[in-house]
Swiss-Prot record:
Residues 43-297 form the Protein kinase domain. Belongs to the protein kinase superfamily. AGC Ser/Thr protein kinase family. cAMP subfamily. It comes from Canis lupus familiaris (Dog). SUPFAM superfamilies: Protein kinase-like (PK-like). A number of inactive tetrameric holoenzymes are produced by the combination of homo- or heterodimers of the different regulatory subunits associated with two catalytic subunits. cAMP causes the dissociation of the inactive holoenzyme into a dimer of regulatory subunits bound to four cAMP and two free monomeric catalytic subunits. The cAMP-dependent protein kinase catalytic subunit binds PJA2. Activates cAMP-sensitive PKAI and PKAII holoenzymes by interacting with regulatory subunit (R) of PKA, PRKAR1A/PKR1 and PRKAR2A/PKR2, respectively. This is cAMP-dependent protein kinase catalytic subunit alpha.
Length: 350
């Protein structure tokens, strides 16, 4: 036993060292953000991959190199109307400063009179959401493989004082090796201590957000519980037709498990979907280690996952660079750029 404990101890030490170095790297970029690193004319626009309330994501090709990227285009006037200025500035400032194997990379960012542009690595496997809906549910080993990547990603983000706040299968892309790329940092925020903004997706909201309490990084660990449940069951733990009914279920502290869930899985989920913050895993004195050392993760080699050495349970079909068959089709729209600058002041730091 002594040996195993010693190994665990030294692993936890090297994680500490790793995170200290990661924080240095992050802070350099956080304090001195990259700005205006490309121009719209350098990209050939190919196809819309997704749409949102104030913009769209398009597959583009960098004319000079022939590389494909995903370009997020945000309409400045719509961002202002929807009161998302702060969130949008957060997203870009955070994305340009982070670096982790399971976070989508921001390659370029720029703006023009009408829009903000974030050009990211293109992840051709599509959303976990579409694969989960097609397959129905993931086996526990399959769900565990993805969950481990989220645990490591949250450990990294939280060590930088970042809360993610938008975990859901739609925001997890599957890359060519079958690993996860977390995308959409629209709700991510750097916060020491507590924050109060109501944001997120109804099914994934922690009770303390619904109850308008100040909340912290523990909301991400609650959301991890929701995600693991949804991956392993095929449906989320709290669902109803109306958000208000979902919220009632979430704050009730009651959750029911499918009969096929293993007892280890149920135990982990009871500790993540824990309404009492003083008992929720990830938020206790041992932090993330309560999760990493849980029996459900007994077979997980955390370092091998980080190094992407574990064989993925599922590799998305891929027909070559620029293949979009893992994404839905959307109506195409011209990108219109005004001759006058819109909302210059609001987005001067972008």
């Amino acid at each position: 036993m002594g040996n195993a404990a010693a190994k665990k101890g030294s692993e936890q030490e090297s994680v500490k060292e790793f995170l200290a170095k990661a924080k240095e790297d992050f802070l350099k970029k956080w304090e001195n953000p990259a700005q205006n690193t490309a121009h719209l004319d350098q990209f050939e626009r190919i196809k819309t991959l997704g749409t949102g309330s104030f913009g769209r994501v398009m597959l583009v090709k960098h004319k000079e190199t022939g590389n494909h990227f995903a370009m997020k285009i945000l309409d400045k006037q719509k961002v202002v109307k929807l009161k998302q200025i702060e969130h949008t500035l957060n997203e870009k400032r955070i994305l340009q400063a982070v670096n982790f194997p399971f976070l989508v990379k921001l390659e370029f960012s720029f703006k023009d009179n009408s829009n903000l542009y974030m050009v990211m690595e293109y992840v051709p496997g599509g959303e976990m959401f579409s694969h989960l809906r097609r397959i129905g549910r993931f086996s526990e080993p399959h769900a565990r493989f993805y969950a481990a990547q989220i645990v490591l990603t949250f450990e990294y983000l939280h060590s930088l004082d970042l809360i993610y706040r938008d975990l859901k299968p739609e925001n997890l892309l599957i890359d060519q090796q079958g690993y996860i790329q977390v995308t959409d940092f629209g709700f991510a925020k750097r916060v020491k201590g507590r924050t109060w903004t109501l944001c997120g997706t109804p099914e994934y909201l922690a009770p303390e957000i619904i109850l308008s309490k100040g909340y912290n990084k523990a909301v991400d660990w609650w959301a991890l519980g929701v995600l693991i449940y949804e991956m392993a069951a095929g449906y989320p733990p709290f669902f109803a037709d109306q958000p208000i009914q979902i919220y009632e279920k979430i704050v009730s502290g009651k959750v029911r498990f499918p009969s096929h869930f293993s007892s280890d899985l149920k135990d982990l989920l009871r500790n993540l979907l824990q309404v009492d913050l003083t008992k929720r895993f990830g938020n206790l004195k041992n932090g993330v280690n309560d999760i990493k050392n849980h029996k459900w993760f007994a077979t997980t080699d955390w370092i091998a996952i980080y190094q992407r050495k574990v064989e993925a349970p599922f590799i998305p079909k891929f027909k070559g660079p620029g293949d979009t068959s893992n994404f839905d089709d959307y109506e195409e729209e011209e990108i219109r750029v005004s001759i006058n600058e819109k909302c210059g002041k609001e987005f001067c730091e972008f």
